[in-house]
Amino acid sequence: MIAQSVLQACVNLGVREFVVCAGSRNSVLVHGLLHHRDQVELYSFFEERSAAFFALGRTLAQPYPVAIITTSGTAAAELLPAVIEAHYQERPLVMITADRPIRYRGSGAPQAIEQSELFSVYAETYD
């Protein structure tokens, strides 16, 4: 339900393109995009940093925001260089990242990093 609400909010805000780096933790988001397939364009990438810069490039070519969806942990961290560029170029880049439960942080569990403030300096809003 949360995933569908997030995706619907993006569509309502004008996102028409989603760049996806599929992973196990963001699979519900990727699956949720199927409900919007007639409204949006999807691009699939294997590597997050390249995907983020592709999404940034799409914001330069389109008059609307572009969203990128990744799994958790270092996959989300790979977006940071493009997020910084988007910030300084004032481009509407939307990052949607999966996350592990809070109890896994600091436990040594894979892909369990502190994501809550990862983009905060360079993002207009962050929740």
Regions found by a protein language model. Give the residues of each.
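N-terminal alpha/beta PP-like core and its mobile active-site loop of ThDP/TPP-dependent enzymes
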Residues: 1-127
